[in-house]
A protein has these predicted regions:
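Flexible, active-site-adjacent loop/turn segments at secondary-structure boundaries
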Residues: 5, 35, 62-64, 167, ...
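TOPRIM fold recognition
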Residues: 94-176
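Short, basic/aromatic recognition patches
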Residues: 1-16
Length: 176
């Protein structure tokens, strides 16, 4: 995944500097043009969660982090795996290292994100690795509705969760 993220640094006027992992957001129809960044900071000193968000000015309604590991153009993809975060996508790959197209919505999936990628990948199977909670189940239902409206067969859109009691793929990797 080394080609699919960078470090972003923010220098504030009060002299503080923050560095985050930044995952470029693109539009599926123009995957070479960055339209924002999904950002993740370091955990705090007390071990609690770090910063999670999007860079100012990001196109969050349509932009997706797309890590196409297949070597083929996006419109030729046969399998696409969706996640709520790039961390979950990379965690799933650590558990199941298969070269597919990995996608993060950077939070709650939007209809614009769904329609954008579905329109470019009409022959692909979509595996929905959203969190195993009420919100994640709703995201799967929303995705299936949009995909059906666009003519996708039900069996081409599948929920894809880690085995066991894990909430998400990162928790599965870390055995939390």
């Amino acid at each position: 995944f080394h080609r699919h993220f960078c470090l972003a640094t923010k220098h504030r006027t009060d002299g503080l500097t923050f560095a985050n992992l930044a995952f470029p957001l693109v539009l599926p129809k123009t995957p070479d043009k960055t339209v924002g960044f999904e950002e993740r900071g370091r955990p705090k000193m007390d071990g609690s969660g770090g910063y999670k968000g999007k860079a100012e000015g990001s196109n969050s309604s349509e932009g997706l982090w797309i890590a196409n590991l297949t070597g083929e153009p996006l419109d030729k993809a046969s399998e696409i795996v969706w996640f709520e975060s790039a961390y979950d996508a990379m965690a799933e790959y650590q558990i199941n290292p298969v070269k597919m197209v990995y996608v993060s919505t950077g939070g709650t999936p939007t209809e614009g994100q769904m329609r954008g990628l579905l329109s470019v990948t009409p022959n692909a199977r979509h595996y929905l690795g959203f969190d195993k909670d009420d919100a994640g189940r709703q995201f799967v239902a929303n995705f299936r509705k949009v995909a059906a409206e666009m003519g996708f067969r039900h069996e081409h859109v599948q929920a894809y969760h880690p085995l066991g009691c894990y909430k998400d793929w990162n928790d599965a990797l870390l055995n939390k």
